[in-house]
């Protein structure tokens, strides 16, 4: 999560808008099993950035995020993120850390929809020439499986607590996939960022990305997701490749 911090810095720091998010993922509602841990590596490469960039080469960032999540109770987990990136010139940069507790509605409640709530908080900077800002994200996760179809909606609220870009805004996300033979899921994902609640940005300065994704259910201990996202507005990154690899370890 860093869309709000970057999108609201546009006029002063246009080059900061070049890179993709460190973590591009629509969440499912279940938490990891009690006493289990999952290690996930998020790799995102921006092939083509915002059309408003003066230099197209500024967009070619590779973002790497290590996410480690442990189940501390049956319906409660805590995740920890380490954000890093390689700039267009190949320089490695450390960008920050965040922690994310999450709770989910127990299956015993027999809700018709899956639901969970997470609060992510920590410090982040867009690159190593900028200051860290304390920021976070409140993420409501609502999902549903019906037959071979899966749907998930994350109406996220992003917030920045320090620096020149203090405020809160909304970054909605959506995913749907159709599972084939319980081995492959094909569908699409959408990611948006509208700006602050107090100042919704003009349409061309908002971020809206959508694209095809694939989920591979190769083994219960592994998580594999990949997608190619396309920008729908001038200020969106125009082409972003996202890859997620996860490995679970049980008690």
PLM features: residue spans?
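Bacterial Sec-dependent N-terminal signal peptides
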Residues: 1-22
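Transmembrane beta-barrel domains of Gram-negative outer membranes and organellar outer membranes
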Residues: 18-251
